[in-house]
Amino acid sequence: MSVCLGVTKGIAVSSLGIYAGILTTGTICTYMVPVDVITKHLNSVVCRVGEVASALGLLSTGFFSLSYFGAPSHLRHPYLIYSALVAPASALYLWAISRCNHKCHAKSKIAEQGKTNGDNKTQSPPLGDSVVDLGADSKVPSGHPPVKEGAKCPMGNAVVTNEPSSTDYARPAGCQSKFAKHLAVVTGVAIIGFLQSVIGVYGEPA
């Protein structure tokens, strides 16, 4: 194995290892930290960690792909492709689950509001005050692009259902539990991908 190929594989494996570590830490925190703490006080941290994880995922995918397509035919091992697909597959899975959950949540919310309005038309929409408070307390990391008034979070409910941005609010504990399970699945995939990449690299002939 050439020095250049060894460097690209080393960067790829290291990036994937840190990526898997971030997902593992995030999964543990999601199970242990209450949802209101995450949404009200850790928005900045979560956003920043997400940016780092995304960068590591791109770095890992890029260098694994470079290691595969830039290597001679007899050194193009399947584990390089499998490892390169870990980050894109994880991101696609979480994106699909997020959109599905937002749509299901929006439908259940509309049904609940319709039932409530039928019983008492003068009753205000649930969590109205919470929406205002969450909007006022939300923070973004330093260097984050400016957020205009009324802008919708790309991972929020409003962008999926074409509703006003005020419909985005903290999800209940049940939703947090479901997301934690999906995050655990992605974490497991990342760990398996990292382990098989390590075994593949050290199992190759020098």
Swiss-Prot record:
Query: Which keywords does this chain's UniProt record carry?
Result: Autophagy, Membrane, Mitochondrion, Transmembrane, Transmembrane helix
Chief place of localization: mitochondrion
How does the record say this protein sits in the membrane? Multi-pass membrane protein
Q: Where is the composition biased (Polar residues)?
A: 114-125
Give the UniProt record's GO annotations in the biological process aspect. Answer: autophagy of mitochondrion; macroautophagy
List where the protein spans the membrane: 13-35, 52-72, 78-98, 183-203
Q: Where is this region: Disordered?
A: 111-130
Does Transmembrane count among this protein's keywords?
yes
Q: Where in the cell is it found?
A: Mitochondrion membrane
The UniProt entry, under PANTHER family, shows: AUTOPHAGY-RELATED PROTEIN 33-RELATED
* Its job: Involved in the selective degradation of mitochondria via autophagy during starvation and at post-log phase.
Give the family, as the similarity comment puts it.
Belongs to the ATG33 family.
- Please report the name of this protein according to its UniProt entry: Autophagy-related protein 33
Organism phylogeny: Eukaryota, Fungi, Dikarya, Ascomycota, Saccharomycotina
Gene name on record?
Answer: ATG33
